[in-house]
Amino acid sequence: AISSIEADYKKLNPNYEIIVINYESLHKVQGRFDLIVLDEAHSMGALPKPSKRAKQVKELITLNQPYVILMSGTPTPESFSQMYHQVYACPKNPFSSFKNFYAFARVHVNVYQKKLGVHSVNVYLDGKQSIIDEMKPYMISYTQKEAGFKAQTNEHVLKVRLKDRTYEIID
């Protein structure tokens, strides 16, 4: 994907400079940026603590104070709760009034506990609709058809019986 973006940039020959990197190279980035575009932003949606990637992005944004565009085909792959760390680096994000994810979760997540061996752990996967409601003004959504995809996807669901032990872990 990087080489494709760079090839398009060369063809367009714009009067601005771009740097295209992957998330794994964030630590190498130097310079000042007016705009940062982050593709696959859902990859920063760790729970309940921010991922290393999200922390690096936050550091870059804090240093540069750029405009930020987050892109993702699947912004909430598991839960609306994942939105928090995707946007927490942006100073004007709709959740910036919360000190951290836990404060955010008290308002926007139905937190429940799950037994893990002899311990109970908090589970933050039941994000409320309020998260999407707060994010709506910042999001642009397209269907595959609106985005120009012509491929028809035919899905087939395969059901597989797991070992009883696996079901015990899940429950």
Predicted segments, located by residue:
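Short beta-strand segments
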Residues: 1-3, 20-23, 105, 159-161
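Conserved Walker A/P-loop ATP-binding site and its immediately adjacent core
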Residues: 1-9, 77-82
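Conserved catalytic network of the ASCE P-loop NTPase/AAA+ motor domain
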Residues: 13, 29, 60-64
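Conserved two-lobed SF2 helicase motor
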Residues: 13-28
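Catalytic P-loop NTPase motifs of RecA-like helicase/translocase cores
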Residues: 26, 43-48, 77-78
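Conserved P-loop NTPase motor "coupling/switch" region that bridges the ATPase
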Residues: 35, 53-146
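Walker B catalytic acidic pair
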Residues: 39-40
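Inter-lobe connector of SF1/SF2 helicase motors
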Residues: 114, 136-171
